[in-house]
């Protein structure tokens, strides 16, 4: 038989008073009207505190970035509205940007993107153009600058032909173009770029005026290393007898009106030696563009991850630095560059080179060793085919192509250009190598300064 004993009665709901009693007739549940807020648990408090703090830090940082950028763009827009020299056919001011490779980074354009993100917007607003040469390897800035200065010196001495000026509207004569180039300025991104730039100046002005091309120099070095020389058994020369000697007859001489083409070409005289006094650099040195030193540090690797996170929430520091650098290039005065600037500017940034960067010579040597071991069999196969000692394989017949010695030589030259260029460039930019400096450069090299109001107002 079922137990019909009544159980414990539920407590009566709390009585609603005040405005709650009026809201009860609107259909709002009784529990909602009696709900009392309480603090969440400790874990939820920690979660919401961290989330809101990080969100506000991100919002504040990006708001400051937007404010700084807008303020500087409005400040320099007036320069972009000024009439261009030469009218509609004139050219705007054009600066050269040297953005060298960061050690250990596979991306060669990292410094270039830094310039385009943090400095370029203000130059565009001010109507200033820029040129960003390609620098795929360590030392590319040095080699390009060396070649440009060498060409300039050879043309000034009459050792190289000069371009014929065109008498067309809007085309500047060489003297005016050089003057505007000096007035435009040069942007150097990071300490590695500064080291390469100064070394390029030294080589260009101190290494003589002999004709020079880096690719040709490397090619000549590789030509005599014996990698592609074949090892063949010596063949004894045949002994000529009276019966074997055949005298040429008149009938054997080709009778043709083009017989002169078979004659050996006359030996052309070698280039005359350049007098020793022409190798001496001019004194004083020709004017050179002022430098804008743009700091740049690139964090790489797992160990530097905390600094990457800090940079993410402190983007305004980079925006402010880029804005100040742009104002220095647009409005700032110039001062003489001193030895201390070359030796100590951004010296701390070199401490951020990771293990991959510092092991670059060992990695290049390992790649070179493995490559030369791998091409030995390829050279033997190519030489055997060219000598007629083997036929085409099935794969070669399907591809309708046989690898020849010339193909391997061209491939090897490309790799050696990259290896030798990287090795030479790393010797210039590695932290143990001091920046190049000459006492005679005092007063010749100049750097842009940030305007005083921009140092405190941004």
UniProtKB/Swiss-Prot annotation:
Membrane-spanning parts: 44-60
Mitochondrial intermembrane side: 61-458
Segments in the Mitochondrial matrix topological domain: 1-43
This protein's UniProt keywords: Membrane, Mitochondrion, Mitochondrion inner membrane, Protein transport, Translocation, Transmembrane, Transmembrane helix, Transport
Cellular localisation: Mitochondrion inner membrane
Chief location bin: mitochondrion
GO BP annotation list: protein transport
InterPro entries: Mt_import_IM_translocase_Tim54
Membrane-topology annotation of the record: Single-pass membrane protein
Database matches in Pfam families: Tim54
Highest taxon of source: Eukaryota
GO cellular component, one term: intracellular membrane-bounded organelle
Family as reported in the entry's similarity comment: Belongs to the TIM54 family.
Subunit structure: Component of the TIM22 complex, whose core is composed of TIM22 and TIM54, associated with the 70 kDa heterohexamer composed of TIM9 and TIM10 (or TIM8 and TIM13).
Function: Essential component of the TIM22 complex, a complex that mediates the import and insertion of multi-pass transmembrane proteins into the mitochondrial inner membrane. The TIM22 complex forms a twin-pore translocase that uses the membrane potential as external driving force.
Protein name: Mitochondrial import inner membrane translocase subunit TIM54
Species annotation: Cryptococcus neoformans var. neoformans serotype D (strain JEC21 / ATCC MYA-565)
Lineage per the UniProt record: Eukaryota, Fungi, Dikarya, Basidiomycota, Agaricomycotina
Gene giving rise to this polypeptide: TIM54
């Amino acid at each position: 038989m079922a137990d019909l004993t009544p159980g414990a009665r539920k407590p009566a709901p709390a009585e609603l008073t005040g405005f709650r009693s009026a809201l009860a007739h609107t259909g709002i549940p009784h529990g909602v009207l009696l709900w009392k807020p309480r603090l969440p648990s400790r874990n939820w408090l920690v979660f919401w505190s961290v989330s809101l703090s990080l969100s506000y830090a991100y919002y504040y940082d990006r708001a400051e970035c937007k404010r700084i950028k807008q303020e500087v763009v409005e400040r320099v827009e007036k320069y972009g509205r000024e009439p261009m020299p030469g009218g509609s056919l004139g050219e705007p001011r054009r600066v050269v940007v040297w953005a060298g490779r960061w050690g250990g980074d596979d991306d060669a354009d990292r410094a270039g993107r830094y310039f385009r993100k943090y400095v370029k917007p203000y130059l565009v607003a001010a109507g200033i153009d820029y040129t960003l040469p390609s620098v795929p390897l360590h030392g590319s800035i040095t080699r390009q600058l060396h070649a440009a200065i060498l060409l300039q010196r050879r043309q000034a001495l009459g050792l190289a032909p000069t371009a014929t000026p065109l008498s067309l509207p809007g085309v500047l004569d060489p003297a005016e173009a050089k003057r505007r180039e000096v007035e435009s300025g040069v942007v150097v991104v990071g300490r590695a770029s500064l080291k390469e730039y100064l070394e390029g100046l030294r080589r260009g002005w101190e290494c003589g005026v002999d004709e020079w091309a880096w690719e040709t120099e490397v090619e000549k070095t590789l030509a005599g290393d014996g990698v592609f020389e074949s090892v063949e058994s010596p063949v004894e020369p045949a002994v000529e007898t009276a019966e074997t000697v055949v005298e040429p007859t008149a009938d054997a001489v080709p009778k043709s009106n083009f017989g002169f083409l078979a004659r050996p070409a006359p030996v052309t005289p070698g280039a005359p030696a350049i007098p020793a006094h022409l190798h001496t650099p001019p004194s004083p040195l020709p004017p050179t563009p002022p430098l804008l030193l743009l700091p740049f540090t690139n964090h790489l690797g797992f160990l530097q991850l905390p600094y990457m996170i800090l940079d993410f929430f402190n983007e305004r520091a980079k925006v402010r630095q880029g804005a100040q650098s742009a104002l220095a290039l647009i409005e700032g005065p110039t001062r003489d560059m001193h030895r201390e600037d070359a030796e100590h500017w951004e010296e701390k940034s070199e401490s951020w080179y990771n293990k991959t960067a510092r092991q670059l010579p060992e990695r290049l040597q390992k790649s070179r060793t493995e490559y030369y071991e791998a091409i030995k069999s390829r050279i033997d196969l190519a030489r055997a085919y060219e000598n007629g000692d083997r036929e085409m394989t099935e794969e070669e017949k399907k591809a309708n192509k046989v690898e020849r010695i010339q193909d391997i030589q061209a491939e090897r030259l490309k790799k050696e250009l990259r290896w030798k260029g990287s090795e030479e460039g790393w010797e210039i930019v590695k932290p143990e190598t001091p920046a190049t400096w000459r006492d005679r450069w005092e007063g010749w090299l100049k750097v842009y300064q940030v305007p005083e109001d921009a140092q405190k107002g941004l």
